[in-house]
Protein backbone atom coordinates (compact mmCIF):
# COMPACT_ATOMS: atom_id res chain seq x y z
CA UNK A 1 0.00 0.00 0.00
CA UNK A 2 1.32 3.44 -0.87
CA UNK A 3 -0.85 5.53 1.42
CA UNK A 4 -2.75 4.78 4.61
CA UNK A 5 -5.10 7.60 5.57
CA UNK A 6 -5.62 7.79 9.29
CA UNK A 7 -8.22 9.80 11.14
CA UNK A 8 -6.57 10.80 14.38
CA UNK A 9 -9.76 11.44 16.27
CA UNK A 10 -13.46 11.14 15.95
CA UNK A 11 -15.06 13.51 18.47
CA UNK A 12 -14.47 17.05 17.27
CA UNK A 13 -12.62 16.03 14.12
CA UNK A 14 -15.27 14.05 12.25
CA UNK A 15 -18.14 15.15 14.47
CA UNK A 16 -19.40 18.49 15.70
CA UNK A 17 -19.59 17.27 19.30
CA UNK A 18 -18.40 14.69 21.80
CA UNK A 19 -20.11 11.31 21.49
CA UNK A 20 -19.00 9.29 24.54
CA UNK A 21 -21.16 11.15 27.06
CA UNK A 22 -24.31 11.19 24.92
CA UNK A 23 -23.87 7.48 24.14
CA UNK A 24 -23.46 6.53 27.80
CA UNK A 25 -26.49 8.68 28.59
CA UNK A 26 -28.45 6.86 25.90
CA UNK A 27 -27.47 3.49 27.42
CA UNK A 28 -27.80 4.26 31.12
CA UNK A 29 -29.89 7.41 31.36
CA UNK A 30 -29.18 10.00 34.02
CA UNK A 31 -29.65 7.44 36.82
CA UNK A 32 -27.03 5.16 35.25
CA UNK A 33 -24.54 7.99 34.77
CA UNK A 34 -25.08 9.19 38.33
CA UNK A 35 -24.61 5.68 39.74
CA UNK A 36 -21.44 5.28 37.68
CA UNK A 37 -20.00 8.50 39.09
CA UNK A 38 -20.69 7.64 42.74
CA UNK A 39 -20.23 3.86 42.62
CA UNK A 40 -16.51 4.02 43.48
CA UNK A 41 -16.13 7.40 45.20
CA UNK A 42 -12.54 7.02 46.43
CA UNK A 43 -11.29 5.86 43.01
CA UNK A 44 -13.24 8.64 41.29
CA UNK A 45 -11.93 11.31 43.67
CA UNK A 46 -8.35 10.07 43.34
CA UNK A 47 -8.58 10.08 39.54
CA UNK A 48 -10.15 13.55 39.57
CA UNK A 49 -7.45 14.88 41.91
CA UNK A 50 -4.75 13.53 39.55
CA UNK A 51 -6.69 14.82 36.53
CA UNK A 52 -6.48 11.27 35.20
CA UNK A 53 -9.01 11.44 32.36
CA UNK A 54 -8.28 7.88 31.27
CA UNK A 55 -9.09 6.45 34.71
CA UNK A 56 -12.21 8.62 35.05
CA UNK A 57 -13.41 7.40 31.66
CA UNK A 58 -12.73 3.80 32.61
CA UNK A 59 -14.75 4.20 35.82
CA UNK A 60 -17.62 5.89 33.99
CA UNK A 61 -17.75 3.39 31.11
CA UNK A 62 -17.51 0.44 33.49
CA UNK A 63 -20.11 1.94 35.78
CA UNK A 64 -22.65 2.38 32.98
CA UNK A 65 -21.98 -0.74 30.89
CA UNK A 66 -21.00 -3.33 33.53
CA UNK A 67 -23.53 -6.18 33.62
CA UNK A 68 -25.37 -5.10 30.47
CA UNK A 69 -25.77 -7.54 27.61
CA UNK A 70 -23.32 -6.89 24.78
CA UNK A 71 -26.04 -7.43 22.14
CA UNK A 72 -28.33 -4.89 23.82
CA UNK A 73 -25.62 -2.21 24.03
CA UNK A 74 -24.49 -2.90 20.46
CA UNK A 75 -28.09 -2.47 19.24
CA UNK A 76 -28.17 0.92 20.98
CA UNK A 77 -24.79 1.64 19.37
CA UNK A 78 -26.20 0.92 15.89
CA UNK A 79 -29.03 3.42 16.46
CA UNK A 80 -26.63 5.94 17.92
CA UNK A 81 -24.35 5.58 14.87
CA UNK A 82 -27.34 6.35 12.64
CA UNK A 83 -27.98 9.54 14.62
CA UNK A 84 -24.33 10.59 14.44
CA UNK A 85 -24.22 9.97 10.69
CA UNK A 86 -27.45 11.89 10.12
CA UNK A 87 -26.73 14.96 12.24
CA UNK A 88 -23.33 15.17 13.90
CA UNK A 89 -20.74 14.75 11.11
CA UNK A 90 -18.67 17.75 10.04
CA UNK A 91 -19.05 18.53 6.35
CA UNK A 92 -15.44 19.64 5.84
CA UNK A 93 -13.81 16.55 7.31
CA UNK A 94 -16.31 14.23 5.63
CA UNK A 95 -15.38 15.81 2.29
CA UNK A 96 -11.74 15.13 3.10
CA UNK A 97 -12.50 11.53 4.09
CA UNK A 98 -14.37 11.00 0.80
CA UNK A 99 -11.42 12.52 -1.09
CA UNK A 100 -9.10 9.92 0.49
CA UNK A 101 -11.55 7.14 -0.35
CA UNK A 102 -11.76 8.26 -3.99
CA UNK A 103 -7.95 8.28 -4.10
CA UNK A 104 -7.96 4.64 -2.96
CA UNK A 105 -6.37 5.31 0.43
CA UNK A 106 -6.99 2.99 3.36
CA UNK A 107 -9.07 4.71 6.02
CA UNK A 108 -8.64 3.83 9.69
CA UNK A 109 -10.47 5.62 12.48
CA UNK A 110 -8.21 5.76 15.54
CA UNK A 111 -10.18 7.15 18.43
CA UNK A 112 -10.89 7.17 22.15
CA UNK A 113 -14.56 6.77 21.22
CA UNK A 114 -16.32 3.55 22.20
CA UNK A 115 -16.57 0.51 19.92
CA UNK A 116 -20.31 -0.18 20.36
CA UNK A 117 -21.12 2.88 18.24
CA UNK A 118 -17.85 3.67 16.45
CA UNK A 119 -17.56 0.29 14.69
CA UNK A 120 -21.09 0.53 13.21
CA UNK A 121 -20.43 4.11 12.19
CA UNK A 122 -17.17 3.05 10.57
CA UNK A 123 -19.09 0.48 8.51
CA UNK A 124 -21.64 3.12 7.52
CA UNK A 125 -18.86 5.46 6.41
CA UNK A 126 -17.06 2.72 4.48
CA UNK A 127 -13.78 2.92 6.39
CA UNK A 128 -11.33 0.01 6.35
CA UNK A 129 -10.92 -0.42 10.10
CA UNK A 130 -11.62 1.12 13.50
CA UNK A 131 -9.16 1.19 16.39
CA UNK A 132 -10.87 2.54 19.49
CA UNK A 133 -11.70 2.19 23.17
CA UNK A 134 -13.09 -1.31 23.79
CA UNK A 135 -15.32 -1.82 26.83
CA UNK A 136 -14.27 -4.91 28.80
CA UNK A 137 -16.37 -8.02 28.19
CA UNK A 138 -17.13 -11.11 30.23
CA UNK A 139 -18.91 -13.54 27.92
CA UNK A 140 -22.06 -11.95 26.53
CA UNK A 141 -22.06 -9.13 29.11
CA UNK A 142 -19.88 -6.10 29.63
CA UNK A 143 -17.49 -6.11 32.56
CA UNK A 144 -15.82 -3.23 34.39
CA UNK A 145 -13.48 -0.89 32.54
CA UNK A 146 -11.75 -0.80 29.17
CA UNK A 147 -9.94 -3.68 27.49
CA UNK A 148 -6.48 -2.40 26.62
CA UNK A 149 -7.05 1.01 28.17
CA UNK A 150 -8.19 4.22 26.58
CA UNK A 151 -7.18 4.77 22.95
CA UNK A 152 -5.68 8.25 23.14
CA UNK A 153 -2.30 9.96 22.88
CA UNK A 154 0.56 7.41 22.79
CA UNK A 155 -1.91 4.50 22.80
CA UNK A 156 -3.25 5.68 19.43
CA UNK A 157 0.25 5.55 17.97
CA UNK A 158 0.93 2.13 19.49
CA UNK A 159 -2.30 0.66 18.08
CA UNK A 160 -1.77 2.19 14.67
CA UNK A 161 1.83 0.96 14.53
CA UNK A 162 0.64 -2.56 15.43
CA UNK A 163 -2.12 -2.37 12.79
CA UNK A 164 0.38 -1.29 10.11
CA UNK A 165 2.96 -3.91 11.18
CA UNK A 166 0.34 -6.70 11.03
CA UNK A 167 -0.11 -5.82 7.35
CA UNK A 168 3.61 -5.23 6.67
CA UNK A 169 2.80 -1.60 5.83
CA UNK A 170 5.37 0.09 8.08
CA UNK A 171 6.58 2.25 5.16
CA UNK A 172 3.10 3.56 4.33
CA UNK A 173 2.51 7.28 4.01
CA UNK A 174 0.17 8.21 6.85
CA UNK A 175 -2.20 11.16 6.79
CA UNK A 176 -3.41 11.98 10.30
CA UNK A 177 -6.12 14.40 11.40
CA UNK A 178 -7.01 15.55 14.89
CA UNK A 179 -8.16 18.49 16.94
CA UNK A 180 -6.32 18.02 20.25
CA UNK A 181 -2.94 17.12 21.74
CA UNK A 182 -4.32 13.64 22.52
CA UNK A 183 -4.68 13.02 18.79
Regions found by a protein language model. Name each.
Residues 20, 54-58, 139-145:
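Acidic/polar active-site rim loop that often engages polyanionic ligands
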Residues 56-92:
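Metal-dependent phosphoesterase signature
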Residues 43-71, 129-134:
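Short, compositionally biased "basic patch" segments
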Residues 1-50:
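Active-site neighborhood of HAD-like aspartate-dependent phosphohydrolases
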Residues 18, 68, 155:
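Conserved active-site and cofactor/substrate-binding residues in soluble primary-metabolism enzymes
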Residues 1, 75, 82-183:
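C-terminal cap/substrate-recognition subdomain and adjoining C-terminal extension
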Amino acid sequence: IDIAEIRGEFDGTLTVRDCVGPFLLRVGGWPGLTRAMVRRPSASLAAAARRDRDRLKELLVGGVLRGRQVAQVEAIGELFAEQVEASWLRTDTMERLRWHQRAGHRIVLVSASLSPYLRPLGRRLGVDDVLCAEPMRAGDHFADGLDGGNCRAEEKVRRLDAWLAARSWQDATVWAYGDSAGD
